[in-house]
């Protein structure tokens, strides 16, 4: 992974302004591409990494308690965990400054459940293959998703280009 790819992801990225006051939860496996975001977003912006073990993360009530006790401001969840936790710990998730999720097709009702809690400050759907250094596009989600059949993949993050190509590699 090139240094510039990590910088593009977490500094002047157009979707989140991280600072020294941010406390970013590290809930992913270190081998998972999301750990690039979870580690470098706080470190390159003077913030704090809050490492949570897998046993805590898979138990909704313990996870919620840890997020609150550790005053986590930023969290990235895989879509599967996001869908599960919007049903069980939505009030805790609603307290976050940034909640990002991605990794597979997202569930509109899960986003709506969380939005009914009037939080988090920024709810961001992320898309992009691992090869783009975690994600390449983002879409901030607001109440207006209620009429949509699916969650949009959004627009490219700063310093990123996205090309739509056909099966032969030609532009669409």
Language-model-derived ranges and their functions:
Residues 1-172:
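Motif- and composition-driven signal specific to adenylation
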């Amino acid at each position: 992974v090139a240094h510039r790819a990590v910088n593009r992801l977490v500094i002047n990225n157009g979707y989140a302004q991280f600072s020294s006051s941010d406390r970013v939860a590290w809930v992913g496996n270190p081998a998972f591409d999301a750990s690039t975001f979870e580690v470098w977003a706080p470190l390159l912006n003077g913030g704090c990494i809050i490492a949570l073990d897998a046993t805590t993360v898979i138990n909704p009530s313990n996870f919620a308690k840890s997020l609150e006790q550790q005053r986590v401001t930023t969290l990235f969840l895989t879509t599967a965990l996001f869908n599960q936790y919007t049903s069980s710990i939505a009030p805790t998730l609603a307290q976050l400054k940034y909640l990002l999720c991605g990794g597979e097709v997202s569930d509109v009702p899960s986003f709506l459940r969380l939005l009914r809690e009037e939080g988090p400050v920024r709810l961001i759907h992320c898309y992009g293959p691992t090869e783009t250094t975690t994600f390449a596009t983002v879409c901030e989600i607001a109440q207006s998703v209620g009429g949509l059949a699916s969650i949009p993949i959004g627009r490219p993050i700063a310093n990123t280009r996205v090309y739509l190509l056909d099966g032969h590699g030609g532009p669409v």
